[in-house]
């Protein structure tokens, strides 16, 4: 009798320990990250890592700022953990305050929007509209790479052309292909998941076709040059 009770208690104890450990790892894996300052360092990928080893974050785009940045609300686990049907993403700016991550697209540079009293560059609006149409109020998967000097998360960004399907596309090459952005040339550039060489090849084609910003010919001022004058 005592032996039976002992075994029963041992089984219950083992079950509680296993559940506790499982719960700890579950909460750790699916913990929501509210802003860039709370992103763990081990979330940041080396851009040379193999595709299958990328650490990614799944979330929802709440606002598009310009042609190469947006606000990202982290929804770990997506619909499987109830997001958008049991758990709602806040809508108002006050509710979203300090709850979203500012994301800068890795590997590309879009025309500059108007700020600091300076006019926007040609095709800045078109670049923003393209990004808005692809990402706004949609779920995306990002590949975190680094935090830049403006406290933005620089990341590769993959969107879903067909909502709720697993097939996804890297947004950066789409913008390069249409002439709505150029390849980022700064020494601090990071490229993921599409490599710099592939982006440069797409840029050459867009330039030859004189698409969008490349239609300006010799009047073109690269975003990096324009920013230095701000």
Swiss-Prot record:
Membrane topology type: Single-pass membrane protein
Superkingdom of origin organism: Eukaryota
Positions of the catalytic residues: 104, 112, 152
GO CC terms: membrane; mitochondrion
UniProt entry keywords in alphabetical sequence: Calcium, Endonuclease, Hydrolase, Membrane, Metal-binding, Mitochondrion, Nuclease, Transmembrane, Transmembrane helix
Localisation: Mitochondrion; Membrane
Transmembrane segments: 10-27
Residues reported in the UniProt entry to bind Ca(2+): 109
EC nos: 3.1.-.-
GO MF annotation: an example: endonuclease activity
EC top class named in words: hydrolase
UniProt-listed CDD domains: SNc
Residues of the TNase-like domain: 55-216
InterPro entries: SNase_OB-fold_sf, Staphylococal_nuclease_OB-fold
Similarity comment: family membership: Belongs to the LCL3 family.
PANTHER family in the record: EBNA2 BINDING PROTEIN P100 (PTHR12302), SERINE_THREONINE-PROTEIN KINASE 31 (PTHR12302:SF3)
Name under which the protein is recorded: Probable endonuclease C19F8.04c
Lineage of producing organism: Eukaryota, Fungi, Dikarya, Ascomycota, Taphrinomycotina
């Amino acid at each position: 009798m005592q032996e039976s009770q002992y075994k029963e208690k041992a089984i219950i104890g083992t079950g509680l320990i296993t559940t506790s450990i499982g719960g700890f790892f579950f909460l750790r894996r699916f913990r929501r990250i509210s802003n860039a300052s709370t992103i763990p360092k081990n979330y940041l990928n080396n851009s040379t890592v193999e595709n299958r080893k990328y650490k990614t974050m799944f979330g929802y785009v709440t606002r598009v700022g310009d042609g190469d940045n947006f606000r990202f609300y982290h929804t770990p686990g997506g619909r499987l953990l109830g997001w958008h049907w049991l758990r709602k993403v806040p809508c108002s700016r006050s509710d979203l305050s300090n709850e979203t991550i500012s994301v800068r697209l890795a590997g590309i540079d879009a025309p500059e929007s108007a700020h600091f009293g300076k006019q926007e560059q040609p095709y800045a609006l078109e670049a923003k509209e393209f990004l808005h149409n692809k990402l706004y109020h949609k779920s995306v998967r990002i590949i975190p790479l680094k935090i830049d000097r403006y406290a933005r998360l620089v990341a590769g960004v993959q969107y879903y052309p067909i909502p709720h399907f697993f097939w996804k596309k890297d947004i950066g090459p789409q913008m390069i292909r249409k002439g709505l952005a150029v390849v980022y040339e700064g020494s601090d550039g990071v490229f993921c998941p599409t490599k710099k060489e592939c982006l440069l090849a797409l840029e050459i084609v867009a330039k030859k076709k004189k698409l969008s910003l490349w239609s300006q010919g010799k009047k073109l001022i690269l975003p990096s040059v324009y920013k230095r004058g701000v």
